[in-house]
Amino acid sequence: MKNAHDLVLEAKAQIHEVALEDAEAAIRAADQLLDVREADEFHAGHIPGAINIPRGVLEFKLSNDPALCARELNIVLYCKTSGRAALAACSLQAMGYRQVQSLAGGFDAWSAAGKAQVAANLPNFE
């Protein structure tokens, strides 16, 4: 019986993962940068320019948003460590999207490398 890790490994074998050192160029070339983490994760910090569409609703949102339904869009996806993004990339390819990439290592790798991010906007009570 397969587990989640097995499914992620299978997905990664079918998609293109962009290496961290190539990520900024891939993001600049992309039409859309999608963060597929949950909303609370996104609000805690994310890559500049990303829009948040959680993995659980991704296919529905893309199908119903005229700006996102064009199959020729160049899309870069990321999540926390790259598992959800790999599964999402596999789904988008199955939907007919032809230019889909997943960020290897996800937001954790991006953050650990000291790359630019939008930090949480927490209230200051002082």
Q: Regions from the language model: what does each represent?
A:
Residues 78:
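Short, surface-exposed ligand- or partner-binding patches at beta-edge/loop junctions that are enriched
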Residues 1-32, 39-74, 83-126:
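Rhodanese-like catalytic fold shared by cysteine-dependent sulfurtransferases
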